[in-house]
Each structure stands twice: as C-alpha cells, then as structure tokens.
Amino acid sequence: MRFSGKQILVTGAASGLGLAIAQAAQTEGAAVTALDRVAAPFDNSRICDITDEDQVRSVLSGLDRLDAVVNSAGIARRAKLGDTELADFEAVMAVNLRGSFLVSKHALPLLRQRGGSILNLSSGVATTGLRNRAAYTASKGAILSLTRNMALDYASDRVRVNCLCPGFVNTPLLSSLPPERRARLTALHPLGRLGEPEDIAHMALFLMSDQASWITGQAIAVDGGFNIGHADDV
C-alpha cells in the first residue's frame, strides 16, 4: 500500500471531497488525522475550527510526525459581488483561504523534518469565474497563488505543494439540482458525466505519493474536460 506508515492530515474530512480523500488514504494504509467542525468517521477525528489559530496550533502540536496535509475544507455563498454581505465574504475567505494558510503554517515544521506534501483544493472556476459566486471564486483563485508561492518557498525543504481544481462533482449540493439542470450541466462535459468524489481522491493520492516526487507548484484540473470546451454543438 502506497501510504503504509504515513501520517496524513485532512481538513473538511467529515463530508464531501475531504471525506473521500481521507477514506482513500486510509484504505491505502495511511493513519489519518481528520479535522472538521463536526466529528468525522475516523479513529483520530478532531473537531477543529480551522479559522481559529489557537485551535489549529493545538491540534498540530499534538502530532509527532506528518507526511502530508490536504486542505479540503471549504464553503460557498451564492451572490453577486454587489449583493454579497461583508460578513459572508469574510466567512468564505476565512474557511477557504485563512484556514488553508493556518493549517499549512503550523504543519510545516513537521513536514520539513523529513519532507512531505501539501495538497490544496482550489476549483475549476478559480480561473473562469462562476456567476453568483464572487466570494468563492476569489478565495479559490487566491489558493492557486498561495500554492505556487508555497511550492517555491519550501522546495528546498523537500516539501511539495500542489493543488487540485475539481470540476462539478456529485456532492449533496449537486444532488439537489432539478433533473433537467443536472442533465444540462452533464452535457457540458466532454467525458459525458459529472465527477464522483472518488475521481478527485484518486488524483489527490497520486499527488501525495512518491510517484509524484518531481511535481510541485502545479494546479491539476480534474473536471471531465470541462475547462477545455463544452461538448454540445453551437
């Protein structure tokens, strides 16, 4: 198993992509530390508000080694910029950006001891935009820049930093869409289907593994070809 004996920390591990990545890592032999605001289904599950530095510091200080970090926790608010309340904008930035910053900052001393990997979750819409998601797309665009800068800063410490840019994945949010909207969205994907959480987890594990030892500072789209053009005729 690729991660036998490895210690991996995953944020947002109670649901969605974080849960899928944490489960896949555990299946491959990793000892997973799962962080979320609610309990996650793992032996070492810690309730932690990643926007609170004291809580993050407390969790990380209790670990004696770490091989990889997955910054998967994220939230969104539906609104155009002019309709976005400051509190909502700050809440999205706090979880999506500040949380990734704080977890990475306090994980780095452990990762630098023997080398390791940080994997951030951005989004396919970070570079294209998405109507009514001003705060979300801004936060995910910032994750792209943060990833590249971290990769430059810590390459000499043998800490690789990459990010995934998932497309439209079957999560509870998409599952709630009316069937006709799901059908229209699916038709925009050259590969003819929406993503599954496992699609993202497979790439996440590759990027954290020794097989990706010469990959850093990269943003990898996992989106069924959505970002290369739409499959329907015009």
Q: At which residue positions do the language-model features occur?
A:
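Short C-terminal tail/terminal secondary-structure segment
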Residues: 128, 216-234
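C-terminal helical subdomain
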Residues: 163, 185-215, 222-224
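Substrate-binding pocket helix/loop in short-chain dehydrogenase/reductase
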Residues: 80-81, 88-90, 174, 185
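Active-site loop immediately N-terminal to the catalytic Tyr-X3-Lys motif
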Residues: 82, 128-134, 156-157, 192, ...
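Residue(s) in the substrate-gating loop at a strand-loop-helix junction
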Residues: 123
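Active-site helix of classical SDR
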Residues: 104, 139, 147
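Alpha-helical segment proximal to the catalytic Tyr-Lys
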Residues: 109, 152-156, 213
